[in-house]
A protein has these predicted regions:
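GST-like domain detector, emphasizing the conserved glutathione-binding G-site
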Residues: 1-134
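Generic structural signal for short, solvent-exposed loop/turn connectors between secondary structure elements
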Residues: 1-2, 155, 209-210
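A generic structural-conservation signal
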Residues: 28, 33, 186, 207-208
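Active-site-flanking alpha-helical
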Residues: 79, 173-174, 208
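Short histidine-centered beta-strand/loop micro-motifs
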Residues: 89-90, 159-160, 207
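GST-like fold's C-terminal all-alpha helical module
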Residues: 105-200
């Protein structure tokens, strides 16, 4: 299989962190990772559009030559294809809560973070949009408070003692925030401590560039 990605973008980074975490658990998927240079517009060229007609990354080329183009679908496909030492473990209730947490982070936090970054210091050269940035910053506060409260029980990772996809999703967006030089934590020491712990993990050390 081949993963077409770009190291900074949150959605590809989520998948890359997921793969690296599974590697740390002894699951070797043999997925080649290929950079698509989005700064040069390679994601909008015919070669990549043949993989993903929406012109986004990531795109996972399967062994049969077809593609998956949504990050969470890629993760769940790999969970099913390599069912040993997965990141979704435990009772149906525990798995449901882990998936719920990942969606909260991706939809309620990751989206505003990405828009905020591009509205303030876009790596793609987009013009600043102060009003949009202010709206996104306001939207981030409730989910950030939710995560701070979640960590108040002493858990080392977002889902408890074991890493899950929610950790990968949050860290992928935070890397983008670091790149655009934005500190989103504010007065949230537990989230800041989680960030330091997660970034010290071998998987994070192998994947994160910022």
């Amino acid at each position: 299989m081949k993963l077409y990605m770009v190291p900074l973008a949150p959605n590809p980074t989520k998948v890359m962190l997921y793969i690296a975490e599974r590697e740390q658990l002894g699951v070797h998927m043999d997925i080649e990772q290929i950079v698509v240079n989005t700064v040069k517009g390679r994601h909008k060229e015919p070669e990549h559009l043949a993989r993903n007609p929406f012109g986004t990354v990531p795109a996972l080329e399967l062994d049969d030559g077809t593609f998956l183009v949504e990050s969470l679908a890629i993760v769940e496909y790999l969970e099913a294809k390599f069912p040993k030492a997965t990141l979704y473990v435990g009772t149906p209730e525990k798995i449901g809560k882990a998936k719920d947490l990942e969606r909260i982070i991706d939809l309620r936090l990751g989206g505003p973070m990405g828009t905020y970054g591009h509205a303030t210091n876009s790596p793609l050269g987009r013009p600043p949009e102060p009003e949009k940035a202010a709206q996104c910053l306001a939207a981030m506060q409730a989910p950030l408070d939710y995560l701070e409260q979640l960590l108040s029980d002493g858990r080392p990772l977002l889902g408890g003692d074991q890493v899950n996809v929610a950790d990968c999703t949050l860290q992928s967006s935070l890397q983008f925030m670091r790149f655009v030089e934005v500190d989103v934590f504010g007065d949230r020491p537990l989230l800041r401590a989680w960030d330091e712990r997660y970034r010290a993990r071998p998987a994070a050390q192998a994947v994160l560039k910022w």
